[in-house]
Amino acid sequence: ELLSEINR
């Protein structure tokens, strides 16, 4: 979730 947002 957290990394998913950073990787956007």
From Swiss-Prot:
Single GO cellular component term: cytoplasm
Coiled coil: none
Record keywords, A-Z: Chaperone, Cytoplasm, Stress response
Compartmental location: Cytoplasm
Signal sequence coordinates: none
Function as written in the Swiss-Prot or TrEMBL entry: Putative molecular chaperone that may promote the maturation, structural maintenance and proper regulation of specific target proteins.
Subunit structure: Homodimer.
Record-stated family: Belongs to the heat shock protein 90 family.
The protein, known as: Putative heat shock protein 2
Species per Swiss-Prot/TrEMBL record: Pseudotsuga menziesii
